[in-house]
Amino acid sequence: MTPTTETTVGIGGAAESTDMVLNIGPQHPSTHGVLRLKLVLDGERITSAEPVIGYMHRGAEKLFEARDYRQIIMLANRHDWLSAFSNELGVVLAVERMLGMEVPTRAVWTRTLLAELNRVLNHLMFLGSYPLELGGITPVFYAFREREVLQNVMEEVSGGRMHYMFNRVGGLKEDLPAGWTTRARGAVAAVRSRMDVFDDLVLGNEIFRGRTRGVGALSAEAVHAYGVSGPVARASGVDFDLRRDEPYLAYGELQDTLKVVTRTDGDCLARFECLLAQTHNALDLADACLDRLAELAPGPVNQRLPKVLKAPEGHTYAWTENPLGINGYYLVSKGEKTPYRLKLRSASYNNIQALAELLPGTLVADMVAILGSLFFVVGDIDK
């Protein structure tokens, strides 16, 4: 039998077709800052995607090496400006581990409380901004209303609305103001009472569900391959949370309240659902911390430190479950008053790499929905 050869002949516009390269950003409003996406398109389909980062690189890790252990806290809370308290917390935990320092119980519980309030502030931003990117303007106003309630109590305790500078090596800057816990409890209750608006207005919206259901599905294998963490990973069925699996601060005593929310679909909708459910749980954890603080007797919230603080020679690694995922802090000391090296492992950096896996095969129209559902901060990527 004579073998046959098949030949495909293009007619008209298909006679010669070339892929188009499209640059999204680095000043596009959907990129949350100066992130650039280099897309290769075949018609309206994305065939390959490359996130191009570095436009906001400020050399934070190098700057750490020229500042002492008190000063680096000021730099540490700036790369992810929506999670400032959690960022500075990770740095002081690494230094305290290097020093072998025990932190007073009251400071431990206060840190846990403020970390969870910071988590809610972070999540509310994305609960409002993500529907906005898909064309729904109303939720962002509700989100900022609730953020303002919590920012007021955070500002009262620390003096800052964004960069709190409340952590210190060995504890906290100072104790909580008189009557603050009562006001904080009222703020948590007020926010909780109005959180249903996101269930009704966003998750109950068929247009939102149509834009996000089945779009940008990330497999558990890809989560492990790219080091994705946080709500994005848990939406793909990866049941891992450092607060439960390797407790730090007071999370070991909060296991009955802590609920690790997971989904299995791994799409944009699942990621939003995880973020919303995690916000509800963070409010519950904040209440549990307030209850525990009410039981504690007055006491110190920091340790006395020498005028010149030096960490012993060696290295250590601390990691925390930040609002956007796992942040790691690798500290190397040569016994001086400044770190020899402080390497940051930021959640946004790893999470955004998954775009190379998520975008190929999808429509350009779905790109913004997928990008926004990764819940990242550009400063956290570039540092």
UniProtKB/Swiss-Prot annotation:
Localization terms from the record: Cell membrane
Annotated EC: 7.1.1.-
Protein species of origin: Streptomyces coelicolor (strain ATCC BAA-471 / A3(2) / M145)
Protein name: NADH-quinone oxidoreductase subunit D 1
InterPro entries noted in UniProt: NADH_Q_OxRdtase_suD, NADH_UbQ_OxRdtase_49kDa_CS, NDH1_su_D/H, NiFe-Hase_large
Entry superkingdom: Bacteria
Membrane topology term: Peripheral membrane protein
Assembly notes: NDH-1 is composed of 14 different subunits. Subunits NuoB, C, D, E, F, and G constitute the peripheral sector of the complex.
Gene of this entry: nuoD1
Role summary: NDH-1 shuttles electrons from NADH, via FMN and iron-sulfur (Fe-S) centers, to quinones in the respiratory chain. The immediate electron acceptor for the enzyme in this species is believed to be a menaquinone. Couples the redox reaction to proton translocation (for every two electrons transferred, four hydrogen ions are translocated across the cytoplasmic membrane), and thus conserves the redox energy in a proton gradient.
Annotated catalysed reactions: a quinone + NADH + 5 H(+)(in) = a quinol + NAD(+) + 4 H(+)(out)
Lineage of producing organism: Bacteria, Bacillati, Actinomycetota, Actinomycetes, Kitasatosporales
Keyword Cell inner membrane annotated: no
Family to which this protein belongs: Belongs to the complex I 49 kDa subunit family.
GO molecular function: NAD binding; NADH:ubiquinone reductase (non-electrogenic) activity; quinone binding
Protein keywords: Cell membrane, Membrane, NAD, Quinone, Translocase, Transport
GO CC terms in record: plasma membrane
